[in-house]
Design a protein with these regions (language model features):
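N-terminal beta-alpha lobe that positions the nucleotide/phosphoryl donor
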Residues: 1-228
Length: 228
């Protein structure tokens, strides 16, 4: 059990983490920008570290500042919350280098699951059912061949994409050819990775998430909700 945890986030998620830490008897360290100096997450924390002025890039996304705050306060672990640095491979690796526990996956896992095509490969090896799809494509000619095997409609997807950016639905070969380079360009400009793959498009699909928690000791728990 940790005695002190730094929360590399702000707002509601930081407050929720602070409440949980308090119930567990663990001290919390908040970080904050000038704009957030009067925020509830700063007030509720046992300690708070000022990150300076500027945008999120200058404060909450500054890996070196967050690591320094943890070292200076003696925090043994960093909880990233969601967003910000929670899926940042470099940040997780920096925590490991400084013997600070990152409350989340290790850097190698974040790297693997941060790219959709490698996540698909891992799922396939674990015999998890998947939609028909491909690995990374070498070009539009390969995309045309693979789309015929999958069957239209298909989606061109950026492997590093997120937030709906870098996805195009293609109903036929002409739409696939017209969209391919555009998706690659979007992926490169938004995620610094032009890699794309194909996946079968399901009309009127529903998005369902299941929360699964696991620790380094092999213990796994799921959280499910029943709607009456």
């Amino acid at each position: 059990m940790f005695s002190k945890v730094l929360i590399a986030n702000r707002g509601a998620i930081a407050v929720r983490i602070e409440r949980t830490l308090a119930k567990m008897g663990v001290k919390s360290v908040a970080v904050y920008s000038k704009a957030d100096r009067d925020s509830l997450h700063v007030e509720n924390a046992d300690e708070a570290v000022y990150l300076g002025e500027g945008t999120a890039k200058d404060t909450y996304l500054d890996v070196d500042k967050i690591i320094k705050a943890a070292l200076d306060t003696g925090a043994e672990a960093i909880h990233p919350g969601y967003g910000f640095l929670s899926e940042n491979t470099v940040f997780a690796a920096k925590c490991e280098e400084n013997n600070i526990k990152f409350v989340g996956p290790d850097s190698s896992q974040i790297k693997l699951f941060g790219l959709k095509h490698s996540a698909r490969e891992i799922a396939q090896k674990a015999n998890v059912p998947l939609l028909s799809g491909t690995g990374l494509l070498k070009g539009v000619d390969e995309a045309i061949v693979e789309a015929e095997k999958i069957g239209y409609p298909v989606m061109i997807k950026s492997t590093a994409g997120g937030g709906g950016i870098g996805i195009r639905i293609c109903e036929n070969k002409d739409e696939l050819v017209a969209s391919y380079d555009n998706v690659c360009h979007l992926a490169e400009s938004n995620f610094n990775d032009a890699g794309v793959f194909l996946e079968k498009y399901i009309r009127k699909a529903r998005h369902v998430e299941v929360q699964i928690f696991g620790n380094e000791y092999g213990e796994v728990a799921t959280v499910s909700y029943t709607h009456l």
